[in-house]
Amino acid sequence: MKRAAIISVILEKPQESKKTFNNIVSEYHEILRGRMGIPFRNGSVALIPLIVEADLDTINTFMGRIGKLEGAIVTVSIASLNIDTE
């Protein structure tokens, strides 16, 4: 059963982790519904909300991979209702 979720990512060292972060996001492109990157002018922090549609295991795996990046802070909000995909 699919759920909608918002994965909020803060990259505290975006210059060091952005390539790996983007590679991980690319691997999960099929579940990604939206993405917005907000870099701060001095480049010290990037805020990235990711809107996804997937089963809970996939959401948790995706979030866990991002969370392993050095300087990454990740939170998720998952809709309690299943998404009707038909």
Question: At which residue positions do the language-model features occur?
Answer:
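Long, contiguous binding/interaction regions
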Residues: 1-86
